């Protein structure tokens, strides 16, 4: 493994689905290049993440068992993806044995993967409760429930969601790109992410009251009707903390492209996504529409460009 290259550690706790197979799904190829190792136990799949915001060279590191985790690998881990067999009632037991290691790595991204939840094994409630307790996100490769076709902000599922989460991570060797004008697309892609967000914060944290009423009144989306730089009115948003979130998003998106700013941007988006994930489906759709519109106005976007965002502009 090349020194200084961060890795996403991938492992499988299933006898019928290997970590290599999961990596091949992530890379979108059955012929992924494998870096040879002396023991042939740990395998490294080089992956270049190249999106509109940054590029980074990472390794998808397949580790078959805990005893194969070397000090070098442990130091490089920045994401943890683990597959389990949901058809077995004890399916989560073997995953739990990895928790002490995960707690020492403290990766920003931790994903629990299965083919789909199983009523005769580990059902959805059990999987989600485990994820919430331990800070994971649940991703089903072949979920029975797919996003509705008429959803304006469809939730990503399966391998697409895994790739999305890995792209949203701020890798230690990230190389930023100059174009910082795509915040609206970023918000769209992340605001409606997986309904199975496994973060304790997503279900337990409570928002504090707005610091000052005066600040709230000056922000986009206030009940009285606020104007962004483009001078257009945006829909009313009741929660004053959401106003503050949008203001901060706008500031981060139009600010400098330094790593600290970028990391805070993704952190804020995840906070807002986690909060939205706790809402009922219809409220979540409306919430996402309002956030997207208010954010677009806050960074000086043209209202004409988002007129078709919702099928019902009256909400």
Curated annotation (Swiss-Prot):
Q: Which Gene3D superfamilies match?
A: 3.40.50.11960
The task this protein performs is described as: May be involved in endocytic recycling of growth factor receptors such as EGFR.
Does the keyword field hold Kinase? no
The record's subcellular locations are: Cytoplasm, Cytosol
Q: Which domain of life is it from?
A: Eukaryota
Cite the residue spans of the region called Disordered: 201-229
**What is the organism field in this record?**
Rattus norvegicus
Q: What is this protein called?
A: Alpha- and gamma-adaptin-binding protein p34
Chain's gene name: Aagab
Q: In which tissues has expression of this protein been reported?
A: Widely expressed.
Q: Which residues does the record list as Phosphoserine (modified residue)?
A: 310-311
Keyword hit for Transport: yes
- Give the record's subunit note: Associated with AP-1 and AP-2 complexes.
Q: Where is the composition biased (Polar residues)?
A: 201-210
